[in-house]
Regions:
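A conserved beta-strand element that flanks and buttresses the S-adenosyl-L-methionine
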Residues: 75
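Conserved class I S-adenosyl-L-methionine
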Residues: 100-142
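Conserved alpha-helix/loop element of class I SAM-dependent methyltransferases that forms part
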Residues: 1-10, 24
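Core SAM-dependent methyltransferase catalytic element
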Residues: 218-230
Length: 230
């Protein structure tokens, strides 16, 4: 989308975490409202507290206190698929807040070969077991093991096969080929220690046309991110 269109806009970042995306957008809009259910909101406030146009709320996306039309633009990137409610229903429920919405939801690997989905099925079984681990030191030890034993080898294989144009056939490679090791490690932690993970197909997202005037699904990574217009 055209970020220049946010000049003069009031923006909401739902599930802001530590404020990574808000840091990028704060200087591009009139006001940005950051919302998160966890104590990450305090980290976001520490990072962005010097921005006079930033407001911080600790709250539940499923029970927001904002009136219809409170914002010009709402976005939630990589959050709604971790909520205990169907993520597309949550998207529909947020429609009154703004005229334009941007979301990123985990994809169901519907545009990938079948073996991607087989690997995902195995990883999902592993995640459901690992998410019960509570000790932080144990979690980070497991994260390191998965980083070096699964993620980096696959990314390395993808990089090698990319020399002959076959890199995209390797799981994880396309998304992580330009990412730093620290970013990949954080993603491994987030991926395996969450209890709830929903995934959607492109066809699932298309059903949002029953609620929004227009739904534009990006053909580019990460899958799927899409813009909804009221």
């Amino acid at each position: 989308m055209d970020l220049g269109a946010l000049r003069g806009a009031r923006v909401a970042d739902l599930g802001c975490g530590i404020g990574r995306w808000a840091h990028y957008l704060a200087d591009r809009c009139r006001e940005i409202v950051l919302v998160d259910f966890s104590e990450a909101i305090f980290v976001a406030r520490r990072h962005l507290g010097d921005r006079p146009n930033a407001l911080f709320f600790m709250g539940d996306i499923l029970a927001l206190p904002f009136a219809p039309g409170s914002f010009d633009f709402v976005y939630s990137l990589g959050v709604l698929h971790h909520l205990p409610a169907p993520c597309l229903d949550v998207v529909r429920s947020l429609k009154p807040l703004a005229a334009r919405h941007l979301y990123f939801l985990y994809y169901a690997l519907d545009n990938r070969p079948a073996y991607f989905r087989w690997l995902l099925a195995g990883v999902t079984v592993l995640r459901k077991g690992l998410c019960r681990v509570r000790g932080e030191r144990a979690r980070w030890a497991i994260t390191k093991f998965l980083l070096w034993g699964l993620y980096l080898p696959l990314i390395g294989l993808g990089r090698a096969l990319d020399l002959v144009g076959l890199g995209r056939r390797v799981p994880l490679y396309e998304f992580y080929r330009d990412r730093s090791r620290a970013r990949i490690e954080q993603d491994v932690y987030d991926r395996f220690f969450t209890r709830i993970e929903q995934r959607v197909t492109r066809a699932d997202i298309e059903t949002l046309r029953d609620t929004f005037r227009a739904v534009t699904i990006s053909p580019d990574l990460p899958y799927w991110h899409f813009l909804c217009e009221r």
